[in-house]
UniProtKB/Swiss-Prot annotation:
UniProt cross-references to Gene3D superfamilies, sorted A to Z: 3.40.50.20, ATP-grasp fold, A domain, ATP-grasp fold, B domain
GO cellular component terms given for this protein: cytoplasm
Phylogenetic placement of the source organism: Bacteria, Pseudomonadati, Pseudomonadota, Gammaproteobacteria, Pseudomonadales
Annotated protein name in UniProt: Probable alpha-L-glutamate ligase
Matching NCBIfam families: PRK10446.1 (NF007764), rimK_fam (TIGR00768)
Cofactor note: Binds 2 magnesium or manganese ions per subunit.
Molecular function GO labels: ATP binding; metal ion binding; ribosomal S6-glutamic acid ligase activity
Length: 301
């Protein structure tokens, strides 16, 4: 197969591993800088150009689109879909998963366990919003934040009011969530490919920190997940329409709660923790399910 990898940086661990795994299995792997791809939108035959040449003959595309380039990245991916190239994850599903609030609304509608979450626009509604999620301590999140940036734990209601008013004053969209104390600063990253959790790891926040992101100094270890956690991760990925996803789950007193569904999960932490060839499993998924003109949405939506 001829497989495109949409990535800003060919030296990133995840990009490198996907290229290695594809080549090991005899595929032609081409890394394309997402922001250097350009297209004629109105042409009769959908096309993408890259460094002066048309991109042709691809069977599948692996999007590794960073949060900051979601809009342009999804436009490029949509064009690939319109050309009949099979996407590992579809543009619609990626755009959906990048909108944190919409993701939670979709997951909630399907009855998937979530922390109590509030959303408001006006500072006048802050006291009621805090009460809605059960009071302090609580977590405030910027909707545009990634890798734990823009996530604040407020120990008191006074602190929560100050932080909320500051964010709202800066015209940021924020959501407020109950703090799951019993999770003890740990979460579980379940790596879903197709309809299977192929690997999972526990991420523990550094001492004095509550955010378990590895980018924030958290540590990772092996963990055995329960059947309920496995099913929750698979269902969450399915609701979002993602073939490959990193589903972050908290263990609470009332079962697994989904924190986030990531459409472009990193491979370094999960591969080094579990010793599994995740990149190889992703390529095998493409071999089994990919191929020209198998894109479900064909770039619509």
């Amino acid at each position: 197969m001829k497989i495109a990898v949409l990535s800003r940086n060919p030296r990133l661990y995840s990009t490198r591993r996907l290229v290695e795994a594809g080549r090991e299995r005899g595929h032609e792997m081409v890394v394309i800088d997402t922001l250097r791809a350009y297209m004629n939108i109105a042409s009769h035959k959908p096309q993408i150009h890259y460094r002066g040449q048309p991109l042709e003959g691809f069977d599948a595309v692996i999007p590794r689109i960073g949060a900051s380039v979601t809009f342009y990245g999804c436009a490029v991916l949509r064009q690939f879909e319109m050309m009949g190239v099979f996407p590992l994850n579809e543009s619609v599903a990626i755009a959906r998963s990048r909108d944190k609030l919409r993701s939670l609304q979709l997951l909630s509608r399907k009855g998937i366990g979530l922390p109590v979450t509030g959303f408001a626009h006006s500072p006048d509604d802050v006291p009621d919003l805090i009460e809605m999620v059960g009071g302090a301590p609580l977590v405030i999140k910027l909707l545009e934040g990634t890798q734990g940036i823009g996530v604040v734990l407020c120990e008191t209601e006074k602190a929560a009011e100050s932080v909320l008013e500051a964010f709202m004053g800066l015209k940021h969209n924020i959501m407020v969530q109950e703090y799951i104390k019993e999770a003890g600063g740990a979460d579980i990253r379940c790596f879903v490919v197709g309809d299977k959790v192929i690997a999972s790891m526990k991420r523990q926040a550094a001492p004095g920190e509550f955010r378990s992101n590895l980018h924030r100094g958290g540590s990772a270890s092996l963990i055995k997940i329960t059947p309920e956690e496995r099913m929750t991760a698979i269902r969450a990925a399915r609701v979002m329409g993602l073939n490959v996803a990193g589903v972050d789950i908290l263990r609470s007193n009332h079962g697994p709660l989904v924190m986030e569904v990531n459409s472009s999960p990193g491979l370094e932490g999960i591969e080094s923790t579990t010793g599994k060839d995740i990149a190889g499993i992703i390529i095998q998924y493409l071999e089994k399910n990919g191929g020209p003109h198998l894109a479900r949405t064909k770039g619509k939506g």
